[in-house]
Swiss-Prot record:
Keyword Ubl conjugation among record annotations: no
Annotated spans, Disordered: 215-306
Protein name per UniProt: Coiled-coil domain-containing protein 50
Organism: Homo sapiens
Keyword entries, A-Z: Acetylation, Coiled coil, Cytoplasm, Deafness, Non-syndromic deafness, Phosphoprotein
Residues where Phosphoserine is found: 5
Keyword Lipoprotein included in the entry's annotation: no
Subcellular location: Cytoplasm
Pfam families registered for this protein in UniProt: CCDC50_N
Domain of life: Eukaryota
Amino acid sequence: MAEVSIDQSKLPGVKEVCRDFAVLEDHTLAHSLQEQEIEHHLASNVQRNRLVQHDLQVAKQLQEEDLKAQAQLQKRYKDLEQQDCEIAQEIQEKLAIEAERRRIQEKKDEDIARLLQEKELQEEKKRKKHFPEFPATRAYADSYYYEDGGMKPRVMKEAVSTPSRMAHRDQEWYDAEIARKLQEEELLATQVDMRAAQVAQDEEIARLLMAEEKKAYKKAKEREKSSLDKRKQDPEWKPKTAKAANSKSKESDEPHHSKNERPARPPPPIMTDGEDADYTHFTNQQSSTRHFSKSESSHKGFHYKH
């Protein structure tokens, strides 16, 4: 292979080559910086445009919401105004009806007053026919009437107020009668409740007394059983039982009692001193309780009779 020959005389120097490389490097760096600046500017423009578009959308949405709120507010104002108009119309109609009713009532009152006046005039004429009047009384009576037969306002008011007074008196009497009946019903209900409460209380006392008697009877049976068990353990008990058996056989030979006679009550069990004291205390307490309940029930029954 043939070698390429290089002319050494035409080669540039080292400094020139370094300077050319530095210029080339600076040019490349400037070009890259310029491209970065252009890209950054484009990116910032894109971001700005996006923000502007977003802001426009938000502003448009807010404007639409504001318009909707204003439209709803105006609609609400219109509805309220319409309701107020309807209420005012209803009130006006009610006032008109009330005025018409008042006018009719006034007309009725005037008719009643006129009828009362005519009736009074007729009665006055009848009295004049039966009894002669004195001049002073006639002058005083004529002063209440007009020449055409009408009544003065004060007399008309008295004539109108007469039926209202009678109606008020009837209403008071009716209210008093209703109050009296209600009071009687309340007293009867109270008496019935008191009697029912007394009956329930007596039943409860009887139930408690029966339960106490059952408990006392059970305790007495248990004590009798325990005393019999103790006696069985005692060696001296057998002769006594034999004597009791002989006495029972003798009693069985005797004639029986009639059915109408009450059977004899069994003898109480033999108790110790402590048990005897407890039983007497219980019987005394039970008898006092019975006496108190009977006296209380009789007192309450007497109170109910009164």
